[in-house]
From Swiss-Prot:
GO CC terms: cytosol; glycine cleavage complex
Keyword hit for NAD: no
Source species of the chain: Shewanella halifaxensis (strain HAW-EB4)
Cross-referenced Pfam families: GcvP2_C, GDC-P
Protein's recorded name: Glycine dehydrogenase (decarboxylating)
EC number of the protein: 1.4.4.2
Amino acid sequence: MTTETLTQLEQHELFIRRHIGPESTQQQEMLNFVGAESLEDLTQQIVPGSIRLNRDLAVGSSCSEAEGMAYIREVADKNKVFKSYIGMGYYGTEVPSVIQRNVFENPGWYTAYTPYQPEIAQGRLEAILNFQQVSMDLTGLDLASASLLDEATAAAEAMALAKRVSKAKKANIFFIADDVFPQTIDVVKTRAECFGFDIVVGPASDAVNYELFGALFQYTNRFGEISDHTALFAELKAKKAVVTVAADMMSLVLLKSPGSMGADVVFGSAQRFGVPMGFGGPHAAFFVTRDEYKRSLPGRIIGVSQDTRGNRALRMAMQTREQHIRREKANSNICTAQVLLANMASFYAVYHGPQGLKVIAERIHRLTDILAAGLTAKGLELVNSTWFDTITVKGGDVAAINARALAAQINLRIDSANDNAGSFGISLDETTTRTDVSELFDVILGSEHGLDVAALDEQIIKADSASIPSELVRTDAILTHPTFNRYHSETEMMRYIKRLENKDLALNHSMISLGSCTMKLNAATEMMPVSWAEFGNMHPFCPLDQAEGYTQLIEELSAWLVDITGYDAMCMQANSGASGEYAGLLAIRNYHISRGEGHRNVCLIPQSAHGTNPASAQLAGMKIVVTACDKAGNVDMEDLKTKAAEVADNLSCIMITYPSTHGVYEETVSEICDIIHQHGGQVYLDGANMNAQVGLTTPGSIGADVSHLNLHKTFAIPHGGGGPGMGPIGVKAHLAPFVAGHSVVKPGRESDNNGAVSAAPYGSASILPITWMYIKLLGYQGLRQSTQVALLNANYVMKKLSAHYPVLYTGRNDRVAHECIIDLRPLKEASGVTEMDIAKRLNDYGFHAPTMSFPVAGTLMIEPTESESKVELDRFIEAMVSIRAEIAKVESGEWPVDNNPLHNAPHTLADIMDPAFDERPYTRQEAVFPTAAVKANKFWPTVNRIDDVYGDRNLMCSCAPVSDYE
């Protein structure tokens, strides 16, 4: 019998062993190899003593997965899921089970990374291309981006695009119709203030009275009215203004497209295409414009190109517009951008097809007609005379009606005194039934109303409803492409999703060692609560007493993150890391303004910074001054002192990353903070590398004032192929009054009236349970050990590879932090083999390439994370060593520079079936089975290397021609 205690047998710490890849014996082997006695010894060798944390985190002890699930269930059950008719951009929807099970809950979809390596991402690239096609068809415009963060931030991007492309160069006014959703107006105003734009809000017809560079309209408007703005748009465009429209995706199935009215930019939320409300997110936004504005489009664009065989292949197009290349000159700071949710929306459109979508839209509209007919028959007045799914009602005792509604677990939209005082709104959706409409009659009119839904339906059919004016009824065909007309049975849809999934490499196949990306385990237990209705079906603008579970979760998570970061407060609003940067910089900006120092607008940024840093600083209205790095990759202290002194009067802040983007703990980080503070500035510490800090040090103790946290990196939210993400910011007490507020939801904080950075008050709230579970399950012991094993794995890989590749930077005791950079430039010079060749060759070995040419061109940055086992690390090391041997054959002349496994990588099944392969100087086995490990678990790229130049010169961002399907 065992001699273990009951406490040991209860295995409260079992999840720690599930999350961390190397077992204890493997850890010791690795420690022995790198020359450390223990994880604590390794920590002391790597982390500077001056910043080391000498206490346990106050997050509680680890618990079992069963205990964690029980805790989160108690929290979820405190949410009261009412039937919400609030609308305002958030609606009930049915998530098709085939999509929920095979996409939303499938690690093959949610653990992939942004498709920078398109040869191993053709599946999700096709799904995103479908999303672009849906967006273009419904809006009637030429070119769509892949996805944006939400409708409100898309509106801000539309304003920025309008300023870039408008020919009214002297105009500085952006007009917003006063019937646009208030949260959208809020976010646009916040962005406009940073840019120095003048915002005018008024009735839509007033737009022509101003000299504008752009204008924004809502279609349908917040009260439900549908307006034909064709003449207004023409008048505005004659004055050189750019017309932007926020549109409802479901309504566009039935309504005349904004593009046909003359709109230049159309955007909106794709949430009601099968993505739960989730208390605000995550949801993908669509963004479509005219072809002539393609170079000014924000965010990713998926385009069609060809591979080396001339076959059709997909890729991210025109990347030179984006932050990772153009930095502060980029069109936007967009990086992570809700790709998983865009994929869900695109699959929703594929599954239902044009006819299925029309039935859904017509059902919503018919039920709205019935509701309107019944209420007006009983003497109530409607504010709007036209509608798709929303009516605004005047008359009756609104307070009493609302009280009856709440008693029946129904949420109505109660308009404020400034907006149709004494009225209430009702927005119906895909989940609304005839029973729901009958219940609404009971609540609004009393149970003796005598109305019958079926009878009202007959009346409407006979009367031929005019709630959508004939001139606004859509007459053109949508979604005619074969993709949207062939996968309508669940069997066919399941197979289509699987076929696309099989083209992609995700964490469910192998390690993804992207430096600065932290592709760690997204544990199933952490993910499961996201699917629960108690989290998914909550409207973000519901009364807060219905969201006690969310409130508790957010408060507990905020308290844990405050302790982990050493800050004093958290703000959960930002929907991505880049959005968090913007939010943090706004807090700094507003802090300076409050002190009468609004002139402080210079942001110092090291030349090694991630591209989002300068792009975000530019969005916050700051001027960027770049500081140099020394030969060791650290911030050049002399240059920093000089630059800080030169701009002292106008210094706003510095943006640094810690550990540095070069993968080392800089010894001078606290001195950097002191220098900035001495010159009146604030310190923004980018949280991209927080996975090397948790439990070992904190940004607050280092001396920083604000950081964003990538919850989709350090704290286990999956990357989703390019989103969702969360970028909450932690701040010191003096910045807490200046974090983002919200125009609709005001929980009673000092920051309530500040401008918003996202549409929802808590951003993508429905994925916060993942991070809550991650911290709850690991506890203080597991969080610290995870960080230590991340350091161990990185140093193990670094030391193993150092015998074959130069390691560019190391820190104290010749160690790296959680990632390492190998320098390929000497090999390129000696052999002609490029970093791109090595990246593509890794695909043949079944691996996603590490981060390429960042922060230094001609390098690979490797971050293995703590979740990878020694077996997987050794498999990756074996692949890299084998590739080095292949390079040696090119160096020696055995293989030609332009005809070898690296130059021709990746290899497909078509390659090895081609008789012409016999003419190559290497064998089929060398091409596709270079090691025994590859043979045991082969991943087959479905296209050869893609021609980027061809794709940009022949830009095509819609589905393939019908001939490809014949």
